[in-house]
Every structure is written in C-alpha cells, then in structure tokens.
Amino acid sequence: IATHTLPCRCKLCGKAFSRPWLLNGHIRTHTGEKPFSCQHCSRAFA
C-alpha cells in the first residue's frame, strides 16, 4: 500500500517520483547525460 503521493512523472516513460530531484536523476537514464566526472581519471558518471 502506497502511503505517499508521486506528483513528479517522467514525460518519456511515465515513471512517477515523490521528489523533483529524483525525477531529474531518472531523466539522465533517457538522455545519457553524465554531469559528474572523477578528478583522477576523468571518467564521467550520472
């Protein structure tokens, strides 16, 4: 039983999230964006 609301919905796949920042992180799975990089090896991460 869900006890909280999920007001933030992905326009691409319909998955719902409780917080906007969780949705923003999820959208990276669709765009392939990797905004964080390692200072030692320069490898990028989402």
Swiss-Prot record:
UniProt zinc finger (C2H2-type) residues: 1-4, 8-30, 36-46
Domain of life per record: Eukaryota
Protein name, per record: Escargot/snail protein homolog
Family, per entry: Belongs to the snail C2H2-type zinc-finger protein family.
UniProt-listed SUPFAM superfamilies: beta-beta-alpha zinc fingers
GO cellular component terms, A-Z: nucleus
One MF term in the entry's GO annotations: RNA polymerase II cis-regulatory region sequence-specific DNA binding
InterPro entries on file: Snail/Krueppel_Znf, Znf_C2H2_sf, Znf_C2H2_type
Subcellular compartments: Nucleus
Keywords from the UniProt entry: DNA-binding, Metal-binding, Nucleus, Repeat, Zinc, Zinc-finger
One Pfam family named in its UniProt record: zf-C2H2
PANTHER family in UniProt: PROTEIN ESCARGOT, ZINC FINGER PROTEIN
